[in-house]
């Protein structure tokens, strides 16, 4: 009898894009979790996860290979190496919280280069100036007709997290923005 083998394939496998001013690449597979918790649980969860959960708007924190993005009061997106079990790690805190694995729901597109800001702003109304959106800033916002989580990793690198079902649309919009950035 033959054996079935499950192979994980990126929703953007084979996609290529960018321009002379912008590089568009699919981020490596990652573990992700949506975390909700009351303020009194933040310290215990931070300790269990190995990263200090940010408590201010647009803030992020990185520790132990994990990045925590503040999405709203009492809500974070956790991103870490593939295989990280955020649900089990958070359970070790022994405090009231909700942690849901969303690793297969999202995909990330890395937008980098001198025209990265222009490419992202082509379909995102967020003010991406250094004063309003410095390195380390993150936000749940819109891009075209979809919701994304935007994270500024460095001066000219943005991580665009979107749902897999919107990956093709998101990548196409970023390709158009990258072309505009090269003009």
Give residue spans per PLM region:
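Basic, glycine/lysine-rich polyanion-binding surfaces/domains
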Residues: 1-183
